[in-house]
Amino acid sequence: VNRLLGRYMNESLFALTAGIATVEEIDKAVSDYVMPIGPLALRDMNGADIGLAVASYNYNEYGPRFAVPALLGEMVEATVLGQKTGGGFYAYDKETRKRAGVNPALAPLLTKALAKDPTCEVLKEFCNKENLAESLFLSMINEAFLALQERICMPEDLDPALMAGLGMRSGPLELASSMGLPVCLAELERRSTICADKGAFSAAERFRPAPLLKRFVWAGRSSVF
């Protein structure tokens, strides 16, 4: 669960850093799509420091497709950690701890993060506000196929685990089947190629299609189940 969640959480930070959508737009798109809470609100609950530790572990464990978003490091350095410090992606009322809009301290951190990782800009070639939710979950779908390929779990167990653990209304395999496996594969290949052509090789690795997904499509399957 945490491995698949990590891919999607990272992509939300890359999209924010690239300026594809605002904090509130990202969270709303995801909540409207399939999640009970947006990734940035969730990160504020857990803390950017925890997020950075988990992202760093995943990178060391799984490699370049888990590249650590520069924004997390900037937030930790500035002690803009989330609810625990009174501000993260959102600002929080000191009395009630309720959200009080987007945190104004975030803007300069986004500028610094983009300067450290300008390849985030390549996301604008294929990600926009209209396809934002699908774009963020495409990485989770791909990671789900990698997990199946490694025989970490059976297909019939993966979606229930994500739905129980994260409160998703539909799991990644159901999402993939709804989109169509050929569509998922074509979109991942397109994105990986665009990133590589632009010299964003780390980003290209994030979208490299899972071999199992390729095999499913080559076998003529349009859905998982």
Predicted regions, residues:
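N-terminal glycine-rich phosphate-binding loop for ADP-containing cofactors
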Residues: V1-F225
